[in-house]
Amino acid sequence: MANKKIDHREEAIELLKQDAKRILQLIKVQMDNLTLPQCPAYEEVLDTQMYGLSREINFATRLGLIEPEEGKKLISTLEKELSALHELSMSKK
C-alpha cells in the first residue's frame, strides 16, 4: 500500500510540473505572437492560469499527494521562469 501512495505522489508531482510547463509555453507563445505583457488580455490569461495551477496544487495537497512545500516550490519556480521570460521579452522590444 505504501508503494502505491509513493507512486501516486510521484505521478501528482509530475502532472503538476507538466501543467506548469504548459503555462510557461502558453505565455511564451502569447508574448511572442499576440500581446505585450502590459496588455490586460495577457494579464488575464496569466492570472487565470496561475490561479488554476494553485487550485490543482491545493487539491493535491489536501489529498496528501504532495507536501505544501512542494507546491510552494513549484509555484515559485514557475513565477521565476515567467519573470525571466517577461524580462527577455521586454529587452527584445
UniProtKB/Swiss-Prot annotation:
It comes from the Bacteria. Pfam families: DUF1507 (PF07408). InterPro entries: UPF0358 (IPR009983), UPF0358_sf (IPR036270). Belongs to the UPF0358 family. HAMAP family: UPF0358. NCBIfam families: PRK13666.1. This is UPF0358 protein lin1058.
